[in-house]
C-alpha cells in the first residue's frame, strides 16, 4: 500500500504541483516516471491515502499507523536526498561557503549541497527527534505524525533558502521557492 502510495502520489504531486500545464499538453508522459519528476508533498498525500485505505480495510486506528510510518519516513528521506546528491539533482544555489560542492555535471559552479543538508536534518535529525519523542507520546495516536509534519516543514522551509529554485517555477513573491510554499 505504502509503496504504491508514495510512487503514485509522488508522481501525481509533481505533475500537479510543479508541471501541470506541461502534462496537460502531454498526458501520456505522466506515466514516464523513469524520466524523473517526483514530489515529496505528493508522495506524502499518497502515503496518507494508502494508510487510510489500509486502516479502513482492516479496521485499524489511522493515526496509530501514520505515527509508525512517520517514525520510518526519515530513513527514506535520508536515502532519497543522498541519491539526489549523487545524481546532481536538486542542487543548491551558487556559493563560496566552506561546504560548497562543484556539481560539474550541472554547470561547474560551486553550490550548496542542499541535498546533504536535507538528508541530515530531514533524515538523521528528524529520525532522532521522533524516536526520542515516541517514548513519551506513543500512547497518544497522531502526535508523532503531527510532529513529523511540523519538523519536516520547518527543516524544508529553512533549507530551501540554500536550494536552487526550479528553473520553470522560479521564486514566488520575490523570496520563496515553490517547495517552501508547499511546506
Which residue stretches match the model-derived regions?
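A feature for loop-to-transmembrane-helix boundaries and adjacent hydrophobic helices
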Residues: 1-183
Amino acid at each position: 500500500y505504502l509503496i504504491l502510495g508514495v510512487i503514485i502520489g509522488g508522481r501525481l504531486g509533481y505533475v500537479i504541483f510543479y508541471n501541470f500545464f506541461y502534462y496537460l499538453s502531454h498526458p501520456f508522459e505522466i506515466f514516464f516516471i523513469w524520466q524523473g519528476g517526483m514530489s515529496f508533498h505528493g508522495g506524502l498525500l499518497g502515503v496518507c491515502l494508502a494508510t487510510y485505505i489500509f486502516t479502513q480495510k482492516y479496521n485499524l486506528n489511522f493515526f496509530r499507523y501514520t505515527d509508525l510510518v512517520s517514525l520510518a519516513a526519515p530513513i527514506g528521506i535520508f536515502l532519497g536526498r543522498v541519491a539526489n546528491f549523487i545524481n546532481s539533482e536538486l542542487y543548491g544555489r551558487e556559493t563560496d561557503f566552506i561546504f560548497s560542492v562543484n556539481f560539474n555535471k550541472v554547470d561547474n559552479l560551486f553550490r550548496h549541497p542542499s541535498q546533504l543538508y536535507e538528508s541530515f536534518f530531514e533524515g538523521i535529525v528528524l529520525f532522532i527527534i521522533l524516536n526520542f519523542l515516541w517514548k513519551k507520546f506513543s500512547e497518544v495516536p497522531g502526535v508523532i505524525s503531527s510532529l513529523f509534519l511540523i519538523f519536516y516543514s520547518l527543516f524544508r522551509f529553512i533549507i530551501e533558502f540554500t536550494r536552487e529554485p526550479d528553473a520553470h517555477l522560479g521564486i514566488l513573491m520575490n523570496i520563496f521557492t515553490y517547495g517552501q510554499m508547499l511546506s
